[in-house]
């Protein structure tokens, strides 16, 4: 009999961490949730009202405004865009949902840019 020990999948661990955190935080109409998803090639941010189940504002590296630069530079532009779009809709305070990722690198760059452009969290 052969026993195979495999390493845990990093994305599965992240999803488990995200589910655990999502049980504790939720977005409302007054203070929606700023959700971040990070892929190998891009970064996506959404401002979500969980009560109504509606996305209020979003931005990603797929937008035409975001194309050049390193992934971290793109994350800064995405943070700026999502903050501008949220502020334009009258949203000033959000709950930051890092999506189970470490608050470091691209996620931190996006959060800092969103703060600089008018979002409070």
UniProtKB/Swiss-Prot annotation:
Chain intervals with Basic residues compositional bias: 13-23
GO MF annotation list: 5S rRNA binding; structural constituent of ribosome
Entries under InterPro entries matching the protein: Ribosomal_uL18_bac-type (IPR004389), Ribosomal_uL18_bac/euk (IPR005484)
GO cellular component, one term: cytosolic large ribosomal subunit
Top-rank lineage group of the source organism: Bacteria
Entry keyword set: Ribonucleoprotein, Ribosomal protein, RNA-binding, rRNA-binding
Main function: This is one of the proteins that bind and probably mediate the attachment of the 5S RNA into the large ribosomal subunit, where it forms part of the central protuberance.
Similarity-based family: Belongs to the universal ribosomal protein uL18 family.
NCBIfam families (UniProt xref): L18_bact
Name of the featured protein: Large ribosomal subunit protein uL18
Organism listed in the record: Streptococcus pyogenes serotype M4 (strain MGAS10750)
Origin organism lineage: Bacteria, Bacillati, Bacillota, Bacilli, Lactobacillales
Gene giving rise to this polypeptide: rplR
